[in-house]
Amino acid sequence: MTTKTQNRHSAAAMAALLLVFGASTANARSWRINNDETKKANFTSINAAMSSEDVQAGDTLYLDPGCVIASQTISKRITLIGTGYLSKAHPTAYITGGLSIKAANTKVEGVYCTGYVYVQASYIILERCKVDSYIHTNGATAQYVSFRQCLIGNYIEGKGTTSNETLGWTIEGCIIRSGYSDGSVRSLYNPIIRNNYILNSYTSTTYSPSALRKITGGLIENNVLLNAKNTRAQTLWDVENSTVQRNVMSCDETKYAATYPDNICLDLGYAEAEPVVFAKTGEDMNIYRLADDSPAKGAGVGGEDCGPFAGAMPFVVYGRPYGIPYWIESQVGTRAIDGKVNIKQKVMMQND
């Protein structure tokens, strides 16, 4: 049984470890965020940190394990590091409502957002994050935004196929599972879309559910792209002037064989295709590792595997930030000895 005392000591120990390991430069400073004032963090929210004159561009903010904050805005160029997500052994910090990122060159890593994310400046990086809803710009200009190793529960949307306002986005090593009636990834100009699993499970043909829609000038390679069976003819929809190569995708063979010859066409919907492509075993997103006889094995450019667990930025289950320690076991003594309580913790380092 996990006690309040155990949680309190574990959070405090992890916070100390994060500050020890997290400092990146001599000048930049590190700050803890925790909505629980009894944890004695530097700030109770990201918003409070942004309002402080002490927090400067280049600083790093760490979300304490178990921290829960709502509707946050990043208005300074900082690095925000979370705890990863949904690990049974480690308390998750998360942001409810939404996260708006308004400062260019901001990096957000290992953060769980239960709502939307607005990317409202250029050169933003989201890495190892979980976003349960959608991602778009909310009307802002945001060039060269990168999404790496992220788990997205709805869609990613730019501002159009000829708009420089969302030029040059990169989506790599991600798992994107949308049930939306439009594209799971859509309205992008000159993007790089590589080594992802992108699904659109919406079944009605009244609309245009697609894995990729309205993409111009893109490089699209080494992905697994799946649609529902009755919409498999539109897995790629309005994709123009793009290099589409070495992907595994659900499709109508009569249409795709000629249009996209350098790809593997599965005349199946996602429900039938997933057990063919993926192992479908293990916990959490490990189910999307390739099956031993998967058609995606070695099917990518240069003989690489397709899908999110291959390539230069392979997906990381639970989204733990690289180089950050996390505790997987904590034991608190049941009896004080000489006024002291014995606490034992097993701490691991995320090394991939």
Positions of the model-derived regions?
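Acidic glycine-/aspartate-rich tracts in secreted/extracellular proteins
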Residues: 37-39, 66-67, 84-87, 249-255, ...
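Acidic Gly/Asp/Thr-rich repetitive segments characteristic of extracellular carbohydrate-active
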Residues: 29-68
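Short, compositionally biased P/S/T/A/G/V-rich stretches that sit at domain boundaries
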Residues: 304-341, 348
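Right-handed parallel beta-helix/beta-spiral solenoid domain characteristic of secreted/periplasmic
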Residues: 71, 77-120, 128, 133-134, ...
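Predominantly extracellular beta-rich ligand-binding scaffolds that present long acidic/polar faces
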Residues: 108, 117-119, 137-139, 149-284
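Extracellular beta-strand-rich, repetitive "passenger/adhesive" scaffolds
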Residues: 37-38, 58-59, 83-93, 106, ...
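Bacterial Sec-dependent N-terminal signal peptides
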Residues: 1-30
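C-terminal accessory segments
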Residues: 265-320
